[in-house]
């Protein structure tokens, strides 16, 4: 499989895209291109007003970023509180379901014991409950 790709350069990226990360030989041709486009870096002479305006812009941007970070921190803290509250609610809901399950099992056991003691068969009790259910359904629909 390696012989299939050995002959061509089709799998390699073009040089414009690889220049983003620098050339493979270790030279810094990207910096040369930038410095030649802007002129020599030692010849750049910024005036005090230009430096002051750049500094003020930097301070404004840092302040804005600081405010955004504070807002994100506040939001993340509120999200954490909401998640903790939701977890507590879910735990309480699980406990409620467990308690309800225990009560239903106990009620069903008591009903089965009552049916056994009364001498009436299970089929008869099921017919009675079915008739009561049909009666409730009929009243609910009309």
From Swiss-Prot:
Bilayer topology: Single-pass type IV membrane protein
Gene3D superfamilies: 1.20.5.110
Source organism of the structure: Saccharomyces cerevisiae (strain ATCC 204508 / S288c)
Bias-annotated ranges (Polar residues): 26-36
Residue intervals annotated with topology Cytoplasmic: 1-117
Similarity field: Belongs to the BET1 family.
Name assigned to this protein: Protein transport protein BET1
Record region (Disordered): 1-36
Residue ranges of domain t-SNARE coiled-coil homology in the record: 52-114
Keywords, ordered alphabetically: Coiled coil, Endoplasmic reticulum, ER-Golgi transport, Golgi apparatus, Membrane, Protein transport, Transmembrane, Transmembrane helix, Transport
Membrane topology, Vesicular segments: 142
Tagged with keyword Protein transport: yes
Main location: Golgi
Any GO BP annotation: retrograde vesicle-mediated transport, Golgi to endoplasmic reticulum
Oligomeric and partner information: Component of a SNARE complex consisting of SED5, BOS1, BET1 and SEC22 or YKT6. Interacts with SEC24.
Residue ranges of the TM segments: 118-141
A GO-annotated cellular component: endoplasmic reticulum membrane
Function: SNARE required for targeting and fusion of ER-derived transport vesicles with the Golgi complex.
Location of this chain's protein in the cell: Golgi apparatus membrane; Endoplasmic reticulum membrane
Gene: BET1
GO molecular function: SNAP receptor activity
């Amino acid at each position: 499989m390696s012989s299939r790709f050995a002959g061509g350069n089709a799998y390699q990226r073009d040089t414009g895209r690889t220049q983003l990360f620098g050339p493979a030989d270790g030279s810094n041709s990207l910096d040369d291109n930038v410095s030649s486009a802007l002129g020599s870096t030692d010849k750049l002479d910024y005036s005090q007003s230009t430096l002051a305006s750049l500094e003020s812009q930097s301070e404004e941007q840092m302040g804005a970023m600081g405010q955004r970070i504070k807002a994100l921190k506040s939001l993340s803290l509120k999200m954490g509180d909401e998640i903790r509250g939701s977890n507590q609610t879910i735990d309480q809901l699980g406990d409620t379901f467990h308690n309800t399950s225990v009560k239903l099992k106990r009620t069903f056991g008591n009903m089965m014991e009552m049916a056994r003691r009364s001498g009436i068969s299970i089929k008869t009790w099921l017919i009675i409950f079915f008739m009561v259910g049909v009666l409730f359904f009929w009243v609910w629909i009309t």
